[in-house]
């Protein structure tokens, strides 16, 4: 007999609560996947010496301080892949505007154009909010 094929679903969420409310991933799996993504964020996010350098590369109000001497892009959400077990990748605001996230490797996720990725309304509002904040300054 042939092996059962488990379909892969992909979602973008901004928090554990957002993930759990989406109804596709159990709360404990959301929490475990996001904990793993936070470790990836600590290890993979590019680090800058100054806030000015970070904001020049990432945009206004899109950086956070790390320890005493570094800045890195602020985490904006999580790209979940669900195929039997949920895994999550940390996402950052994209440089192209309100509709785009990117991961540490530079891959982009555009909620208006990305096929097969379902974005939560909270994820969309989160990115839009940062673009609005950027325009105010």
Which residues are covered by each model-predicted region?
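Mitochondrial intermembrane space
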Residues: 1-137
